[in-house]
Amino acid sequence: MNRRTAEVERYTLETQIRVQVDLDGTGKGKFRSGVHFLDHMLDQVARHGCMDLEVEAKGDLHIDAHHTVEDIGIALGQAFAKALGDKRGIHRYGHAYVPLDEALSRVVIDFSGRSGLFYEVEFPRDRIGDFEVDLFVEFFRGFVNHAQATLHIDNLKGLNAHHVAETIFKAFGRAVRAAVERDARTAGVLPSTKGLL
């Protein structure tokens, strides 16, 4: 069975991004984005998504992290679209609930071919260290627009901003893992009655 891998390079006047993904990996990650808290979250995605993921980025961090975070989401979405190909034989849908102490989040994803982000997260503060938490929505929007996926992210409980972020990214990894997993019973079959995703 072919491994589902992809490499994407995205170069703009604001950022230079390289992403490698192996959807059939073991959870290994290597991250050098210059945005340390995002690297920590991407490591959660790789580990809990059981995918191998490498991200290298150089961005205009002297301004802020916005372009770098958003463009990593875009490149990751492009890599997923490339690795999944025509999506034959995958489950297509995935969901996960993840707790961390007082925090609890739910993520549901559909690799439907239709892009949509439905993000209901209230952080108890604006920053985690020097990371602006409103950049998470830019990351996920970039991802769904280029992976052509519908993504629902709901934080159900949480008092600690770091815990909230971790539950979101761990649940995202686990939901993605479930959705892209191959289903032996439907090998070679497109998971849609429409005949196209």
UniProtKB/Swiss-Prot annotation:
Record's catalysed reaction(s): D-erythro-1-(imidazol-4-yl)glycerol 3-phosphate = 3-(imidazol-4-yl)-2-oxopropyl phosphate + H2O
Keyword Lyase in record: yes
Subcellular location(s) per record: Cytoplasm
Gene Ontology annotations of biological process type: L-histidine biosynthetic process
Pathway stated in the Swiss-Prot or TrEMBL entry: Amino-acid biosynthesis; L-histidine biosynthesis; L-histidine from 5-phospho-alpha-D-ribose 1-diphosphate: step 6/9
Family of this protein: Belongs to the imidazoleglycerol-phosphate dehydratase family.
UniProt keyword annotation of Cytoplasm present: yes
EC id: 4.2.1.19
Keywords carried by this UniProt record: Amino-acid biosynthesis, Cytoplasm, Histidine biosynthesis, Lyase
Protein name: Imidazoleglycerol-phosphate dehydratase
This protein's GO CC annotations: cytoplasm
One Gene Ontology MF term: imidazoleglycerol-phosphate dehydratase activity
Gene3D superfamilies, per database record: Imidazole glycerol phosphate dehydratase, domain 1
CDD domains assigned: IGPD
InterPro entries: IGPD_sf (IPR038494), ImidazoleglycerolP_deHydtase (IPR000807), ImidazoleglycerP_deHydtase_CS (IPR020565), Ribosomal_Su5_D2-typ_SF (IPR020568)
PANTHER family xrefs: IMIDAZOLEGLYCEROL-PHOSPHATE DEHYDRATASE, IMIDAZOLEGLYCEROL-PHOSPHATE DEHYDRATASE HIS7
Enzyme class: lyase
Residue ranges crossing the lipid bilayer per the database entry: none
